[in-house]
Amino acid sequence: MGLLNDTKHEITIEIAPGKTMSIQVGKLAKQAHGSAVVRMGDTVAMVTACEGNPAAFDFFPLTVEYREAAWAAGRIPGGYFKREGKPSEKEVLTCRIIDRPIRPMFPDGYKNEVQVIGTVLSADEKYDPDVLALTGGAAAVWLSSRFPITEPLAGVRVILVDGQYIVNPTYAESESAELELVMAATEKSISMVEGGAFEVPEDKLIEAMEVGHEAIRKIIAGIKQLQGILGIQKAEYVAPVKDEALAARVSALVKDKFLATFRGKHPKTVLYPALEAIKTEAKAALSDIEDPVVLKKAMGYLDEVKRDAMREVILADGIRPDGRAPHETRQAECEVGVLPRAHGSALFQRGETLGLVSATLGTRTDEQRIDSLRGETFKNYMLHYNFPPYSVGEVKRVGTTGRREIGHGHLAERSLAPVLPVPDSFPYTLRIVSEILESNGSSSMASVCGGSLALMDAGVPIKEPVAGIAMGLIAEGDRIAILSDITGTEDHLGDMDFKICGTTEGITGFQMDIKLDNGLPKDILKRALEQARQGRANFLAAMNAALSESRKEISQYAPAILSLKIPEDKIRDLIGPGGKVIRGIQEESGAVINVDDGGNVTISAVARKAGQKAFRMVQELMMEAEVGKTYPNAKVKSITSFGAFVEFLPGKEGLVHISELENRRVEKVEDVVALGDQIAVKCIGIDGQGKVRLSRKATLA
């Protein structure tokens, strides 16, 4: 068979009726510890996985990279260097959807460096390669004996269109989707879901997840088939033997203190120092331990006791660290119009999480240009999320926007998108910026609430206000507590982070990560969604108390944007020879004018009067001469021996014959008018060639 194909194996999986996916191993990147090539249509993604040496970290050092190279779509990148630069937002978001479900597959305590790299090899105009890379990453770590994971995993995209669910849809199918989600799951349980929707009810989300999980099971069956063909035996991870005596000693030192602290109903500003004090006291009590490795192990046992203590208090007493019951949300307060020159602004405080959110209205020239595998597109709505270190009282490097910030911003952005007005009715470019000033969990959800208020404060006519809530879960056997509006501690020590955004009518955005090995039972998922709906209602009420509907007028500091439609055969008249006419209007009015091939004209100006002047000038330019109509401000453009040519409408000239200048005989045209004069004229005729005859004397009393 040759060098390229002697180790190649490939399977084809029908993931839905008439829709297939292939997974190939053994041909490309054979020196990687694991690799898989996944294909749908002509879209192909290759993902590799490599294992390094154990790292001296307190966390699992997994890194995920994903690149959409322009050559995969038969394109050359733009820019001076003509090569791919830093990862795009789409590439960063895809890294996150690969990372989040794969990371929990590895056992606790595993510290070897692992690097997963996804590369798009071919991109057609039908299928998005992101979910192929997700499945490829999961297949790469499973179809290798190096990685000690116990279950294979796969991912799909699901949309809802006209009541039908479609798995791994085409781009065209996705354009009319009411709901879209990307999910990852093992054969038994769902581990990650994220997506957006146009105010769909909760049951539609559950149905979409069930459809997706069924398709994932088919993919996993194919991956297992490949495993059998390759004869791969999975590595077993041998966890370090627990030092029971040391663990018992640590537990005796801190358990009761942790239990008492978590029952103390403390805010974060009290809770965190109290927990740190317990740790400091424990270190002092363990000062006889000289070996730093053993001391580090003891601190690990301490963290386990802390986790168990918080969970026990919630499950046994029904009390959360800040004193709330599981279903209770934190108090929310809102203010709008807090920044004098911002077009719209809001403060949203939820417990100890505070977001300052601004909304800025721009023009068409402010749209973001995106160069992707599908070509160049423009984006007229953006939401940017910033999480400075001072928001949690830390000192860290401030610089490049991190993946977490990009991910949180994307969730908030897509959650607000369904309620925005269509560009035809509101032709502004919108930018929302959320600055997190304080944080104790759910900062991305504060960005959604604050973003909704900032848009309304800016006068953006949104369909409905949107609120977001983060749900958590504590599960130990049959004991389960669903937590509304979780804090940072509950997120870190709990079993679920389920962010749900929506209006009173339905869901607009969501993101779920599950840490449970057996997944989330359907009845618990339903309860969590219902509890989230009730929590959203609390926040919507607080938001409505601050501002119940969009302001009737946009900010005086926002640019004026006016639009009108002109006949397509008049576009050339607006532009003029070499752009002369449109440039003249812009220079005279101070506005900026854009016209597309369909005759849609957009006029933008910093000063409203400038925009209105340009609007009138364009309207006048589109006017046709009417016999019998008087034009009071015609401008003399040129003078001949037989008359004067005047511009009576923008870009339209006519002749005032010398005999039509005065009621008396005129010897010289210059005796009556001069270049640049403005005179009143009346249209007295239009010949067969469209030439306009004008009269000044017809306007004289």
Where are these regions (language model features)?
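Long, basic N-terminal domains or extensions that often function
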Residues: 2-238
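Mobile "lid/hinge" segments at catalytic clefts and subdomain interfaces of large enzymes
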Residues: 146-263, 455-552
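Single-stranded RNA-binding regions, centering on S1/OB-family and related RNA-binding modules
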Residues: 559, 568-701
